[in-house]
């Protein structure tokens, strides 16, 4: 029933499902950012047996030994084909061959069944004749025991052998109890397992409409992204055009701007230089006049009579000789002015080159705004197309017959659930009968083995090696009786147990080998996929059932595998044959509509970097003459002292010499002149030095600017021509390329979205994984794990225990002779004939007819018995 139920679940979905088309791959492109919300199912994908799985594997190994051959796909196909025939001719060679193949495959199972049947037939017969034989005082029925030299050894061997066999039987009984309990507990889980599967199936039914709504909702996300780019066409398209033009234009404008800055710096440097030269001319004249005055004063002071007297005369002569150093630098007054160059630069600055450059920058930066102004109409048209695409997609999804599919499948699920819930109590009732029957069987075996254990226990504990067979104690005798009771029960019930073992073995082994194992390896599906097997008119049953196109390859194995991979129903069942979503979505048609609108997008840009006035301005600056100035002459003067000597040192030296003179007018006059020289240094020399420093800085600026000025301007003008030519010749192609790129971006959103719709409907929507899980639950879990595995473990354990009852009863019969109290025993009158064992035990032979009050009717020698 479980197998039929699982198959109906799968075929029910197949027979009532029609959906969209299948993409070329089951893997979504990495560029897609859409993802359907994950659906969580309650039923586990796999079933784990737990620790008892070790016992199940032990049974599987035994079955592999009994039936090691591979699954007979061809034989099963031919058998099913024969089964569908209205009349079977058993005399046909192919029928005979098929029968032989079946026998060959089932050889191991048949052999075990034959052995079991022999056991069933022979055990009652053997038991009957054994009983009759015992009643005739044969077969160990005579209560007399011969004394044997190896008797104690045999007793121990029989006891140990029986104990080992009883342990083996106990293990088998344990397997039986465990298997019986597993069936009981697992059947109780069936209701919860069924409810879990039906809950997952209803989750599938409920989630599918939500998935479709989610897919439709993602169009708004896509459209909003496209609208954002359309509303930002100034930054997206205009920015793209600007980024393409910027590398060829900005460097030129930056160079022109730096040149405009250089012109301003040149003007400032020339103005500073011109004013500095005028200041130097005036300051140098004043310095020369001051030095002339101080020299006149010093000469007048040196005319003092004291200078004629030794040693003052030497000091005066020294001072007189140094007066020639008090001169100014006349070359400072000869430096040429820069009025002409300054006038040229001022003429250049009459044209606002910096403003012209800013206009070039502005014309470039205005590209995004100009693009937005010129594309307003086109953007509105594209938005209308995008809105219409949304309506088309909504119409396509509404035409998908998913609601009809879900409604039909929902009815099927409800009917199946009602059927299962209606029959589960019956199943649980039958399970109770099975459990009670298994409990009785295991208890019966337990009773038998308990008698054996009690017999061993009483026999071993009550055995007295000094007692004769006729004088054995009550405990030992009870042990022997227990053993014989076990033997009697074994003969009475073991053949009945073997009947149960054979029947369950044949059923369980064949179901395991022909259903469970091939289901796991999918070989069973390959048999069902055999062309013309299930329907002689259809090559492939599923495609014929669904589409009436039996030539289309749609197999049970492929459908089951796809469902296990959580693939959507549409792609799993190749339902594009009834509703091709690719044709209805028609991605190229929708993207073509967007492309046609984008083709009408035209952008005109007139960019002029620098006019003729700006070019002439640069050329005039290059010809202003600052590159032809003799900067070395200016720099040479800036390195010289304004006076012929360091006036401060001269003043200190003069003051020292004056101090060496005797006090008087000459000394005072020289000190006053020294102070005057210090004042000249402070008021005349230091300002000149400051002016020379300013002149040096201005000269360096002009020298740096004028160095290679003509070449730089020529290079800038060449770059300007190149940039302007690039704008003239390439702007239109740049606009076209960026427009296409912009269009591909807009179209790409919808291509990805439409492809995602196709992929989702084909691979994700209405994932049939719950159906595969339900089939696994019905076959692999319920039938194989809940029923067949415990059933196989049951017959394996009970069969092992039953088989070992045979050697157990043999050893029990042998061993009972050593525990039971005998009616007679061997008597030895001659001590020389007493067995050595008896001598060792201190028994000198039996000389009386009555020993311990027990009549001894047989008084013969051992040879008579």
UniProtKB/Swiss-Prot annotation:
Acetylation keyword on record: yes
Organism encoding this protein: Homo sapiens
Biological process (GO), any one: podocyte differentiation
Residues with attached carbohydrate: 220, 274, 395, 414, 548, 580, 729-730
Origin: domain of life: Eukaryota
Residue spans, topological domain Cytoplasmic: 130-157, 455-486, 814-865
Further comment found in the protein's record: Is used as marker for hematopoietic stem and progenitor cells (HSPC) for somatic stem cell isolation.
Entry protein name: Prominin-1
Subcellular location: Apical cell membrane; Cell projection, Microvillus membrane; Cell projection, Cilium, Photoreceptor outer segment; Endoplasmic reticulum
Transmembrane stretches, start-end: 109-129, 158-178, 434-454, 487-507, 793-813
């Amino acid at each position: 029933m479980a197998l039929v139920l699982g198959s109906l679940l799968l075929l029910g979905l197949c027979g009532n499902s029609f959906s969209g088309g299948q993409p070329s791959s089951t893997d979504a492109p990495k560029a897609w950012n859409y993802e359907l919300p994950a659906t969580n199912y309650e039923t586990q994908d796999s079933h784990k047996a737990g620790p008892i799985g070790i016992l199940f594997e032990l049974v599987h190994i035994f079955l592999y030994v009994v039936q090691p051959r591979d699954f007979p796909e061809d034989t099963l196909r031919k058998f099913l084909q024969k089964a569908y025939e209205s009349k079977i001719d058993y005399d046909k060679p192919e029928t005979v061959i098929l029968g032989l193949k079946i026998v060959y495959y089932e050889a191991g199972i048949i052999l075990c069944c034959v052995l079991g049947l022999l056991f069933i037939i022979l055990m009652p017969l053997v038991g009957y004749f054994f009983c009759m034989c015992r009643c005739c005082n044969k077969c160990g029925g005579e209560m007399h025991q011969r004394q044997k030299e190896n008797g104690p050894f045999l007793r121990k061997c029989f006891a140990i052998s029986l104990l080992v066999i009883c342990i083996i039987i106990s293990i088998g009984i344990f397997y039986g109890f465990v298997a019986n309990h597993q069936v009981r507990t697992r059947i109780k889980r069936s209701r919860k397992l069924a409810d879990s599967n039906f809950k997952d199936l209803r989750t599938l039914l409920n989630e599918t409409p939500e998935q479709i709504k989610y897919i439709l909702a993602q169009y708004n996300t896509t459209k909003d992204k496209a609208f954002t780019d359309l509303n930002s066409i100034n930054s997206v398209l205009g920015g793209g055009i600007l980024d393409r033009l910027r590398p060829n234009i900005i460097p030129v404008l930056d160079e022109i701007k730096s040149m405009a800055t250089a012109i301003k710096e040149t003007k400032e440097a020339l103005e500073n230089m011109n004013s500095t030269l005028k200041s130097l001319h005036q300051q140098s004249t004043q310095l020369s006049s001051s030095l002339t005055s101080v020299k006149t004063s010093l000469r007048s002071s040196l005319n003092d009579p004291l200078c004629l007297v030794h040693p003052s005369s030497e000091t005066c002569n020294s001072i007189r000789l140094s007066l020639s150093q008090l001169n100014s630098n006349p070359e400072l007054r000869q430096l040429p002015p820069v009025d002409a160059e300054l006038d040229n630069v001022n003429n250049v600055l009459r044209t606002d080159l910096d403003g012209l450059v800013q206009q070039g920058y502005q014309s470039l930066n205005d590209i995004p705004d100009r693009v937005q102004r010129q594309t307003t109409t086109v953007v509105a048209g594209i938005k209308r197309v995008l809105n219409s695409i949304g309506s088309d997609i909504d119409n396509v999804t509404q035409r998908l017959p998913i609601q009809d599919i879900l409604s039909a499948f929902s009815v099927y699920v409800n009917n199946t659930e009602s059927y299962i819930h209606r029959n589960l109590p019956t199943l649980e009732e039958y399970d109770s009968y099975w459990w009670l029957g298994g409990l009785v069987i295991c208890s019966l075996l337990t009773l038998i083995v308990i008698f054996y254990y009690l017999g061993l226990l009483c026999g071993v504990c009550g055995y007295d090696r000094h007692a004769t067979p006729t004088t054995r104690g009550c405990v030992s005798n009870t042990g022997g009786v227990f053993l014989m009771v076990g033997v009697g029960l074994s003969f009475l019930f073991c053949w009945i147990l073997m009947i149960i073992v054979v029947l369950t073995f044949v059923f369980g082994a064949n179901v395991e080998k022909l259903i469970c194992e091939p289901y796991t390896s999918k070989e069973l599906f390959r048999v069902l996929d055999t062309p013309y097997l299930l329907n002689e008119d259809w090559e492939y049953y599923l495609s014929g059932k669904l589409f009436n196109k039996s030539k289309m390859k749609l197999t049970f194995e492929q459908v089951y595998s796809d469902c296990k991979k959580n693939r959507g129903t549409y792609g799993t069942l190749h339902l594009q044959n009834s509703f091709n979503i690719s044709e209805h979505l028609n991605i190229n048609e929708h993207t073509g509509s967007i492309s046609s609108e984008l083709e009408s997008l035209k952008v005109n840009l007139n960019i002029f970097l620098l006019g003729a006035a700006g070019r002439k301005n640069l050329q005039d600056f290059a010809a202003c003459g600052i590159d032809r100035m003799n900067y070395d002459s200016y720099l040479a003067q800036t390195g010289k002292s304004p006076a012929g000597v360091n006036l401060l040192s001269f003043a200190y030296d003069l003051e020292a010499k004056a101090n060496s003179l005797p006090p008087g007018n000459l000394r005072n006059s020289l000190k006053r002149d020294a102070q005057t020289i210090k004042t000249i240094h402070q008021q005349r020399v230091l300002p000149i030095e400051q002016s020379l420093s300013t002149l040096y800085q201005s000269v360096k600026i002009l020298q740096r600017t004028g160095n290679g000025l003509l070449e730089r301007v020529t290079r800038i003008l060449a770059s300007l021509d190149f940039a302007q030519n690039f704008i003239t010749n390439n702007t239109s192609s740049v606009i076209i390329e960026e427009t296409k790129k912009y269009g591909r971006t807009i179209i790409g959103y919808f291509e990805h979205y439409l492809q995602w719709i196709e992929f989702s409907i084909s691979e994700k929507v209405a994932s049939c994984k719950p159906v595969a899980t339900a089939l696994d639950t019905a076959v692999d879990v319920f039938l194989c794990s809940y029923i067949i595995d415990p059933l196989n473990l049951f017959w394996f354990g009970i069969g092992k225990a039953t088989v070992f009852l045979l050697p157990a009863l043999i050893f029990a019969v042998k061993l009972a002779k050593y525990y039971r109290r005998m009616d007679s025993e061997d008597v030895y009158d001659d001590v020389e004939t007493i067995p050595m064992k008896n001598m060792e035990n201190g028994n000198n032979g039996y000389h009386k007819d009555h020993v311990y009050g027990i009549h001894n009717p047989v008084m013969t020698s051992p040879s008579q018995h």
